[in-house]
């Protein structure tokens, strides 16, 4: 512990375990992506797109310019995706889909008379499959795929497919080439080889339902577990045994409204919510095949930008550093440097009140001194039987 004496400002103290997360204020952060140079691209809520050069810390701002066709289509950026060819895809609210490549913006918008265009200008989620097809989740227009080479769109909605709902909130492509589609009314899964969609409300057997069907993010970890963030808790699905575990506040979750999921280099999970950050360590019982989950909670007292984080605004960088975005900027951290203090602090009494008045050291009550030294150094306190109203 480092103690600092100040001029007229009292005593300050610092320990590395107190503030665990570095903070950068860059506005209300809604999305984070990394390019091939290790630079950060940060989407904001109505403040445009920020290109943050990681080596110099210099930000470059992209905003919508009405008179400039080569500019961002909307300052409300909702999601970002860097594809394998190095292009940056930018989902916006109200402005459709942008693609940024070598200083040029290409815009994709809904055109009412063109059924092969974007179905909705509110883009919520993006993903790229192994064929280079960009998958697009919209807010009301269903799921779409875009072939960047031809500019051709294909649409999947509740009318043309078994999609659970037309508001798509999250997209994730699993190792077995399935597209996990989180919607406002359940989870859909597409086999990318056949384009067949099935929808789930819980386990395949029907034994357990998701805690809530309004899904904020879907994520597959290195174990093959499917993590599902909802408005009413975190759902963890083990497809090997068709078992669903639901974590709530009583299980150590920071808040029921979970919004973001990411796995660190140690195969542990970090979950953002409306009230803080939860670090989850999964532990496997080899006999039963079941997992137990240990949770640690962090909030503003640990250096977080605030307790509130934005939906899917979380990213693990190529360096292993994790970036999480919220209403007051981003926090960055390496999970190995977050130390959890398992030593319980000693309990100290700091005040002793007799008849609602604090007893001072050396002060005489009646004919005797009750405290001859500071309270935390006293083994016992002797009182007269009439001195029967006290508190510590």
Predicted regions and their residues:
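Short, intrinsically disordered, charge-balanced linker/junction segments flanking boundaries
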Residues: 1, 77, 87, 133, ...
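Residue-level "micro-hotspots" composed of small/polar
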Residues: 9, 21-30, 34, 60, ...
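Beta-propeller domains
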Residues: 169, 175-176, 185-188, 213-217, ...
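Loop/turn residues immediately N-terminal
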Residues: 7-11, 45-49, 93-97, 139-143, ...
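Residue-level detector of Asp-centered blade-edge/turn motifs that repeat once per structural unit
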Residues: 34-37, 82-85, 128-131, 172-176, ...
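Short loop/turn segments that connect beta-strands within beta-propeller blades
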Residues: 14-18, 53-57, 100-104, 147-151, ...
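Conserved beta-propeller blade signature
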Residues: 2-4, 39-41, 87-89, 133-137, ...
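An edge-strand/N-cap motif at the start of beta-rich repeat modules
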Residues: 1-47, 54
């Amino acid at each position: 512990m480092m103690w600092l004496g100040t001029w007229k400002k009292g005593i300050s103290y610092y320990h590395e375990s107190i503030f665990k997360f570095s903070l950068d204020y860059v506005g209300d952060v809604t999305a984070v992506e990394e390019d091939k140079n290790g630079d950060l691209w940060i989407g904001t809520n109505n403040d445009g797109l920020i290109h943050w050069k990681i080596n110099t810390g210099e930000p470059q701002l992209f905003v919508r310019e009405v008179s400039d066709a080569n500019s961002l289509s909307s300052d409300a950026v909702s999601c970002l995706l860097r594809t394998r060819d190095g292009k940056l895809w930018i989902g916006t609210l109200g402005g459709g889909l942008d693609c940024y490549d070598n200083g040029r913006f290409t815009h994709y918008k809904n055109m009412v008379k063109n059924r092969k265009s974007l179905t909705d200008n509110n883009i919520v989620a993006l993903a790229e499959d192994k064929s280079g097809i960009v998958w697009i989740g919209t807010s009301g227009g269903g799921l779409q795929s875009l072939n960047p080479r031809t500019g051709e769109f294909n649409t999947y909605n509740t009318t043309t497919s078994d999609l659970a709902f037309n508001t798509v909130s999250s997209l994730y492509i699993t190792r077995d080439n399935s597209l996990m589609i989180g919607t406002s009314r359940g989870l859909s899964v597409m086999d990318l080889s056949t384009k067949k969609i099935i929808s789930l409300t819980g386990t395949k057997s029907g034994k357990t339902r998701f805690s809530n069907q309004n899904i904020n993010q879907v994520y597959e970890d290195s174990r093959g577990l499917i993590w599902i963030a909802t408005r009413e808790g975190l759902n963890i699905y083990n497809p090997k045994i068709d078992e669903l575990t639901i974590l709530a506040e009583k299980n150590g979750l920071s808040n029921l409204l979970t919004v973001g999921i990411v796995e660190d280099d140690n195969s542990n999970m970090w979950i953002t919510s409306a009230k803080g950050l939860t670090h989850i360590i999964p532990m496997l019982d080899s006999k039963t095949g079941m997992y137990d989950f240990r949770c640690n909670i962090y909030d503003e007292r640990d250096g977080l930008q605030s307790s509130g984080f934005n939906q899917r605004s979380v990213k693990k960088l190529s360096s292993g550093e994790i970036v999480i975005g919220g209403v007051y900027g981003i926090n960055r951290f390496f999970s190995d440097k977050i130390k959890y203090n398992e030593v319980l602090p000693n309990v100290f009494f700091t005040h002793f009140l007799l008849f609602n008045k604090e007893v001072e050291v050396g002060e005489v009550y009646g004919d005797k001194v009750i405290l001859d030294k500071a309270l935390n150094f006293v083994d016992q306190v002797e009182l007269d039987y009439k001195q029967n109203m006290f508190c510590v």
